[in-house]
Design a protein with these regions (language model features):
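Signature for HUH/AEP ssDNA processing cores
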Residues: 1-95, 101-129, 215-216, 220
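C-terminal accessory nucleic-acid interaction domains of nucleic acid-metabolism proteins
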Residues: 35-50, 121-223
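Flexible loop/turn segments at secondary-structure boundaries
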Residues: 96-98, 157-158
Length: 223
Protein backbone atom coordinates (compact mmCIF):
# COMPACT_ATOMS: atom_id res chain seq x y z
CA UNK A 1 0.00 0.00 0.00
CA UNK A 2 1.53 3.30 -1.09
CA UNK A 3 0.30 5.21 1.96
CA UNK A 4 1.99 2.83 4.42
CA UNK A 5 5.53 3.54 3.28
CA UNK A 6 7.21 5.47 6.14
CA UNK A 7 8.88 8.84 5.59
CA UNK A 8 12.64 8.34 5.41
CA UNK A 9 15.50 10.79 5.02
CA UNK A 10 18.43 10.15 2.68
CA UNK A 11 21.27 12.17 1.24
CA UNK A 12 20.45 13.72 -2.14
CA UNK A 13 23.63 12.14 -3.52
CA UNK A 14 22.13 8.70 -2.81
CA UNK A 15 18.89 9.31 -4.75
CA UNK A 16 19.76 7.07 -7.71
CA UNK A 17 21.05 4.30 -5.45
CA UNK A 18 17.93 4.39 -3.26
CA UNK A 19 15.67 4.17 -6.31
CA UNK A 20 17.59 1.11 -7.49
CA UNK A 21 17.90 -0.76 -4.19
CA UNK A 22 14.92 0.30 -2.04
CA UNK A 23 12.47 0.85 -4.91
CA UNK A 24 10.23 3.35 -3.08
CA UNK A 25 6.83 4.17 -4.55
CA UNK A 26 7.35 7.89 -3.93
CA UNK A 27 10.28 10.26 -3.46
CA UNK A 28 10.31 14.02 -3.02
CA UNK A 29 10.71 15.67 -6.39
CA UNK A 30 13.08 18.30 -4.92
CA UNK A 31 16.10 17.92 -2.66
CA UNK A 32 16.08 20.08 0.49
CA UNK A 33 18.75 21.12 3.00
CA UNK A 34 16.63 20.10 6.01
CA UNK A 35 15.51 16.68 7.28
CA UNK A 36 12.30 17.93 8.97
CA UNK A 37 12.91 15.49 11.79
CA UNK A 38 11.17 16.42 15.03
CA UNK A 39 13.33 18.62 17.22
CA UNK A 40 15.59 19.89 14.43
CA UNK A 41 15.75 23.57 13.55
CA UNK A 42 15.69 25.00 10.06
CA UNK A 43 19.17 25.74 8.68
CA UNK A 44 20.55 29.24 9.14
CA UNK A 45 19.63 31.16 6.01
CA UNK A 46 16.38 29.26 5.51
CA UNK A 47 15.26 26.31 3.45
CA UNK A 48 17.02 25.75 0.13
CA UNK A 49 15.83 23.47 -2.65
CA UNK A 50 17.37 21.81 -5.68
CA UNK A 51 15.79 19.84 -8.48
CA UNK A 52 14.01 19.90 -11.84
CA UNK A 53 11.14 22.17 -12.79
CA UNK A 54 8.23 19.76 -12.74
CA UNK A 55 4.70 19.55 -14.16
CA UNK A 56 1.81 17.16 -13.63
CA UNK A 57 -1.23 16.79 -15.89
CA UNK A 58 -4.13 14.64 -14.75
CA UNK A 59 -7.75 14.33 -15.82
CA UNK A 60 -10.77 12.13 -15.40
CA UNK A 61 -11.95 13.14 -18.89
CA UNK A 62 -9.69 10.65 -20.63
CA UNK A 63 -6.13 10.61 -21.85
CA UNK A 64 -6.86 12.18 -25.26
CA UNK A 65 -7.74 15.52 -23.62
CA UNK A 66 -4.63 15.33 -21.43
CA UNK A 67 -2.37 14.59 -24.39
CA UNK A 68 -3.72 17.58 -26.32
CA UNK A 69 -2.89 19.77 -23.32
CA UNK A 70 0.62 18.34 -23.01
CA UNK A 71 1.31 18.86 -26.71
CA UNK A 72 0.18 22.49 -26.33
CA UNK A 73 2.67 22.87 -23.49
CA UNK A 74 5.44 21.30 -25.58
CA UNK A 75 4.77 23.81 -28.35
CA UNK A 76 5.05 26.63 -25.80
CA UNK A 77 8.44 25.31 -24.67
CA UNK A 78 9.60 25.10 -28.27
CA UNK A 79 8.52 28.73 -28.79
CA UNK A 80 11.10 29.55 -26.09
CA UNK A 81 13.67 27.70 -28.25
CA UNK A 82 13.80 24.90 -25.68
CA UNK A 83 14.63 21.44 -27.00
CA UNK A 84 11.87 19.27 -25.46
CA UNK A 85 14.07 16.19 -25.83
CA UNK A 86 16.13 17.62 -22.94
CA UNK A 87 13.13 17.22 -20.62
CA UNK A 88 12.17 13.94 -18.98
CA UNK A 89 8.64 12.83 -19.84
CA UNK A 90 6.59 10.16 -18.08
CA UNK A 91 3.19 8.53 -18.36
CA UNK A 92 1.91 8.37 -14.78
CA UNK A 93 0.05 5.09 -15.36
CA UNK A 94 -3.34 6.63 -14.59
CA UNK A 95 -4.44 9.15 -17.22
CA UNK A 96 -1.63 11.52 -16.43
CA UNK A 97 1.67 12.86 -17.70
CA UNK A 98 4.69 14.13 -15.75
CA UNK A 99 7.43 16.39 -17.07
CA UNK A 100 10.78 17.32 -15.52
CA UNK A 101 13.02 20.02 -16.98
CA UNK A 102 16.59 19.72 -15.63
CA UNK A 103 17.70 22.66 -13.52
CA UNK A 104 20.81 22.94 -15.69
CA UNK A 105 18.55 24.19 -18.51
CA UNK A 106 17.82 27.46 -16.68
CA UNK A 107 20.30 27.91 -13.80
CA UNK A 108 24.04 28.21 -13.39
CA UNK A 109 25.82 25.25 -11.73
CA UNK A 110 27.00 27.29 -8.71
CA UNK A 111 23.43 28.39 -7.95
CA UNK A 112 22.16 24.82 -8.26
CA UNK A 113 24.85 23.57 -5.90
CA UNK A 114 24.02 26.20 -3.27
CA UNK A 115 20.28 25.53 -3.37
CA UNK A 116 17.51 28.05 -3.99
CA UNK A 117 14.96 29.40 -1.53
CA UNK A 118 11.28 29.02 -2.50
CA UNK A 119 12.22 27.24 -5.71
CA UNK A 120 8.84 25.50 -5.79
CA UNK A 121 7.09 28.89 -5.87
CA UNK A 122 9.12 29.98 -8.89
CA UNK A 123 8.11 26.76 -10.62
CA UNK A 124 4.48 27.41 -9.68
CA UNK A 125 4.69 30.90 -11.16
CA UNK A 126 6.11 29.55 -14.43
CA UNK A 127 3.36 26.91 -14.57
CA UNK A 128 0.69 29.54 -13.92
CA UNK A 129 2.07 31.82 -16.64
CA UNK A 130 1.97 28.96 -19.16
CA UNK A 131 -0.93 26.92 -17.83
CA UNK A 132 -2.73 24.47 -20.10
CA UNK A 133 -5.86 22.41 -19.27
CA UNK A 134 -5.43 19.67 -16.64
CA UNK A 135 -2.12 21.05 -15.33
CA UNK A 136 -2.24 20.42 -11.58
CA UNK A 137 -1.24 23.56 -9.66
CA UNK A 138 -1.46 21.84 -6.28
CA UNK A 139 1.89 20.08 -6.66
CA UNK A 140 4.04 23.10 -5.82
CA UNK A 141 4.46 22.69 -2.07
CA UNK A 142 7.35 23.57 0.21
CA UNK A 143 9.03 21.96 3.23
CA UNK A 144 8.96 18.20 2.61
CA UNK A 145 7.57 19.06 -0.78
CA UNK A 146 5.75 17.09 -3.41
CA UNK A 147 5.85 13.32 -3.25
CA UNK A 148 6.63 12.24 -6.82
CA UNK A 149 5.67 8.77 -7.99
CA UNK A 150 8.62 6.67 -9.14
CA UNK A 151 8.81 4.15 -11.98
CA UNK A 152 9.66 1.34 -9.55
CA UNK A 153 6.34 -0.28 -8.67
CA UNK A 154 3.17 -1.60 -10.26
CA UNK A 155 0.18 0.59 -9.33
CA UNK A 156 -2.26 -1.85 -10.90
CA UNK A 157 -2.70 -5.60 -10.41
CA UNK A 158 -0.67 -8.61 -11.49
CA UNK A 159 -3.17 -9.33 -14.26
CA UNK A 160 -3.56 -5.68 -15.24
CA UNK A 161 -0.23 -3.94 -14.51
CA UNK A 162 0.07 -0.16 -14.60
CA UNK A 163 3.46 1.49 -14.23
CA UNK A 164 4.66 5.04 -14.36
CA UNK A 165 6.92 4.81 -17.41
CA UNK A 166 9.60 6.99 -18.97
CA UNK A 167 8.91 8.03 -22.55
CA UNK A 168 10.57 10.23 -25.17
CA UNK A 169 9.06 13.48 -26.40
CA UNK A 170 8.58 11.94 -29.85
CA UNK A 171 6.77 8.91 -28.41
CA UNK A 172 4.57 11.19 -26.35
CA UNK A 173 3.44 13.08 -29.44
CA UNK A 174 2.36 9.82 -31.08
CA UNK A 175 -0.16 8.82 -28.38
CA UNK A 176 -3.59 9.38 -29.88
CA UNK A 177 -5.90 7.22 -27.76
CA UNK A 178 -6.29 5.60 -24.36
CA UNK A 179 -5.38 2.13 -25.60
CA UNK A 180 -1.94 3.29 -26.72
CA UNK A 181 -1.41 4.92 -23.33
CA UNK A 182 -2.47 1.81 -21.40
CA UNK A 183 -0.33 -0.47 -23.54
CA UNK A 184 2.79 1.61 -22.88
CA UNK A 185 2.10 1.55 -19.12
CA UNK A 186 1.94 -2.25 -18.93
CA UNK A 187 5.71 -2.73 -19.06
CA UNK A 188 8.20 -1.07 -16.68
CA UNK A 189 10.46 1.54 -18.27
CA UNK A 190 12.64 3.41 -15.79
CA UNK A 191 14.55 5.63 -18.19
CA UNK A 192 14.98 6.57 -21.84
CA UNK A 193 17.75 8.41 -23.64
CA UNK A 194 17.51 12.14 -22.96
CA UNK A 195 19.41 14.89 -24.76
CA UNK A 196 22.01 16.41 -22.40
CA UNK A 197 20.81 19.70 -20.87
CA UNK A 198 22.03 23.05 -22.19
CA UNK A 199 21.33 26.48 -20.75
CA UNK A 200 18.26 28.09 -22.32
CA UNK A 201 18.41 31.84 -21.80
CA UNK A 202 14.69 32.44 -22.20
CA UNK A 203 13.85 29.81 -19.57
CA UNK A 204 16.55 31.27 -17.33
CA UNK A 205 15.03 34.74 -17.53
CA UNK A 206 11.49 33.51 -16.82
CA UNK A 207 12.53 31.50 -13.76
CA UNK A 208 14.69 34.35 -12.44
CA UNK A 209 11.80 36.81 -12.83
CA UNK A 210 9.59 34.40 -10.88
CA UNK A 211 12.19 34.13 -8.11
CA UNK A 212 12.64 37.92 -7.94
CA UNK A 213 8.88 38.45 -7.83
CA UNK A 214 8.56 36.04 -4.93
CA UNK A 215 11.37 37.79 -3.01
CA UNK A 216 9.55 41.10 -3.50
CA UNK A 217 6.30 39.62 -2.18
CA UNK A 218 8.09 38.23 0.89
CA UNK A 219 9.65 41.63 1.64
CA UNK A 220 6.30 43.41 1.30
CA UNK A 221 4.54 40.90 3.54
CA UNK A 222 7.24 41.22 6.21
CA UNK A 223 6.73 44.99 6.55
Amino acid sequence: NDSKEPWQVFSAEDRAKILETDRPTYVTVLDCNHSFKEGTDEPQGGLKYRGPMYFDWDAKDGIVAVMDSVREFMEMLESLTFDVSQARWYLSGSRGVHCEIPQECFMDPRIIAAGVGNLHLAYKRFAFEHITPYLDMRVYTGKRGRQWRTTCNNRGTEDNPRYKVAITADQLREITDEEMYKELCKTPCHSVEVTPPTLNRQLKVEVQVALDDNKLRVRKNSK
